[in-house]
């Protein structure tokens, strides 16, 4: 919502990004702000960045058309140039997220506890799904490479954590995105990420009051929200729900404070 409709950070209005790389930069700023104002982890989905790939594609295409005006360059050649430049921008955008997350400090004096969700099934159409696959591929490739420490040695960064969803389009040889699963497995063998979620089991286990199953990311690295249907819209809601983190309740204190009154006990609880 903040990427699509704009947001305010430190009193400055940030409008909807006009390129993929800008969207990645703003996403890291949002991550840092949220991490500084809550306990517990948070998660973002690469699906929310996918629409900005096409925004950049159209922007780059317009630039290429202007550059090639009057030249005898085929449409196919122009498309190749556009896609090459687009891949380069996606590379820079993903790198921005990786390095910003591990170098930004929250008000707690630590890096944001962030998980990146990679789920092809969230895409709204075929083009967005293909663009999302490019982002996922670049994210996994960069994590496989790692980041350099102060000695210049490639190491595994602690954050962001990665979660990859296994689904019908990527789980078996011959499926359209099986190459991503192979790449993810190769990365896990070296870097111990990504973790994996089964879409099939999530749809069976996370069923809302409408009887519909849902596949979604956890908060941070392990805690899953319970299914929730927004009473105003009648639709399930998982993104944008505040993560309060782990809470300890002193039942003895609550009992003493209630003075033996059961109604007051549950009200305090």
Model-found features: residue ranges?
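Conserved catalytic cores of very large enzyme subunits
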Residues: 1-269
């Amino acid at each position: 919502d903040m990427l699509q409709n704009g947001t305010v950070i430190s009193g400055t209005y940030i409008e909807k990004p006009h390129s993929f790389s800008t969207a990645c930069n703003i996403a890291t700023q949002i991550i840092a702000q949220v991490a500084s104002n809550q306990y517990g982890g948070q998660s973002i989905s690469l699906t929310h960045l996918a629409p900005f790939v096409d925004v950049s594609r159209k922007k780059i295409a317009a630039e290429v058309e202007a550059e090639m005006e009057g030249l005898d360059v085929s449409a196919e050649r122009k498309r190749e140039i556009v896609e090459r430049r687009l891949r380069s921008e996606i590379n820079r955008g993903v790198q921005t997220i990786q390095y910003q997350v591990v170098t930004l400090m929250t008000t707690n004096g630590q890096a944001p506890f962030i998980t990146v969700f990679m789920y092809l099934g969230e895409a709204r159409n075929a083009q967005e799904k293909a663009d999302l696959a490019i982002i996922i591929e670049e994210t996994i490739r960069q994590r496989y490479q790692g980041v350099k420490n102060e000695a210049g040695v490639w190491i595994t960064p602690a954050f962001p954590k990665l979660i990859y969803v296994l689904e019908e389009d990527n789980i078996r040889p011959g499926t359209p995105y099986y190459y991503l699963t192979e790449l993810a497995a190769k990365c896990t063998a070296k870097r111990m990420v990504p973790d994996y979620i089964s879409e099939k089991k999530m749809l069976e286990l996370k069923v809302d009051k409408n009887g519909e199953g849902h596949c979604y990311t956890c908060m941070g690295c392990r805690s899953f929200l319970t299914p929730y249907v927004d009473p105003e819209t009648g639709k399930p809601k998982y993104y944008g729900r505040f993560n309060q983190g782990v809470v300890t309740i002193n039942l003895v204190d609550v009992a003493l404070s209630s003075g033996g009154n059961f109604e007051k006990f549950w009200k305090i609880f």
